[in-house]
Amino acid sequence: MENTYCTQLEYIADYLKQTSFYIYAGPAARIRAYSVPKDYFTCKSIQHFKPYLTPNLPKRFHYANNIRIDKVHLLVDQQWLAVRDNRYTACNGGNHGYDNEFKSMQAIFLGYGPGFKEKTEVDPFENIEVYNLMCDLLHITPAPNNGTHGSLNHLLKNPFYNPSHAKEESSPSSCPVVNLSPPSELGCTCNEMLDVSEINKRLNLTETNSRNLPYGRPRVLQKENTYCVLSHHGYVSGYSYNIWMPLWTAYTVNNQENTSSLPPTVSDCLRADVRIPVAQSQNCSDYPEGLNFTRGFLYPPNFNSSGLEQYDALLTSNIVPMYPAFGVLWDYFHNVLLQKYSRERNGINVISGPVFDYNYDVQGNNPSFTPLNCSGSLEVLSFILPHRPDNTESCAVSPSEWVEKRVQAHVARVRDVELLTGLDFYQERQEPVSEILQLKTFLPTFETDIN
């Protein structure tokens, strides 16, 4: 529960003066209206809610794909309520239904009996995991459900169920360097590059997995997904022949004592990857001027210090379509936030890739994930960032004022990422599968305590 006060109310009628609407008032307000105003209402001063259209809600809510779900949702600040107007009176006291990122929304689980460990305190877990736990205590097989069976084995003296890793449905093929000169330039140019053949020799690697994939290659759980593993000096990617872009890209960012800004990316340079057949490659001509989207790099080329090393990432196999507005967030996240996280954690490993969720049911419809970790006990942060043509979710002009808040608003469980991408992570990590599942189902919080 959370304290609420009649002095802390947002009157939505003040925002929708010309619109007929019905509001389900409270800490998780929903609005039903015949027409949704184009004004996003995020930039009024001292505003205590964040509005979302249903498709743009954070994926961790699993709340979007149903005809009964309203069009507009208000994520309200702690201890505030969103109501229609000043006639609302049921406001003093307490309430629940706020964002489950808030610690005040967490319940207390007490387990007592012969099956439970004694005097044991564990990290928070979600309610959807309790059903499997109850079935294990009764020694019965649970019906299909949204929980991750085995993720609460650490609560039990003698776990009834022993989980195993998911079976990989599509294994990677090889993408060798057959010719040092590309059969087609794919409409790409790179004016500053001198010797194409010498630079392409750098792509003739067998693997760099031990550094960039310390916990193993992500397994693909979707059938008939044709892809190959591309190794580079600075990163590894799983390139899909089905979608003509990487399923995932992995790299390690070391803790740098030098805190100066990263070098700029080599300008006006993108080149064909000689390892990928022309028929399965994106073309630079796919991105002419005048479109509302451009191309972005999954692995930032400027993470390499020299121009020679940057050419390893200035490849058509490293690009994804990207709205320019999203590129502002993407660049700041990599150039500033990842460097910050690397210093705080003494180095991080990153996996990122595209998500396709056209009907926003939080299940992958086709083949942003960023785990951060340190040595010893693994720590993970996962984010599923909505790829939108504008940044109206945030108001501040400077990226330093809004990007990290936006990223944190879209934090997710690793399990959410797996459901969306059809990938399975950490299969080569040397620890029991139940402990890996515990890691995958944990939802980090960034809450600031309120007195």
PLM features per residue range, with description:
Residues 83-87, 119-123, 145-147, 361-363, ...:
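Short conserved micro-motifs at the rims of enzyme active sites and ligand-binding pockets
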Residues 133, 151-152, 158, 163-451:
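Domain-level detector for secreted/extracellular nuclease and nuclease-toxin modules, and
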Residues 18-120, 125-133:
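Active-site neighborhoods of enzymes that stabilize oxyanions during catalysis
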Residues 39-55, 82-83, 141-147, 329-335, ...:
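Acidic/polar loop patches that form or flank catalytic/metal-binding clefts of enzymes
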Residues 48-69, 141-173:
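Polar, surface-exposed loop/tail segments
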Residues 24, 67, 102, 123-128, ...:
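Solvent-exposed, acidic/flexible segments
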Residues 134-142:
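Short, hydrophobic alpha-helical segments
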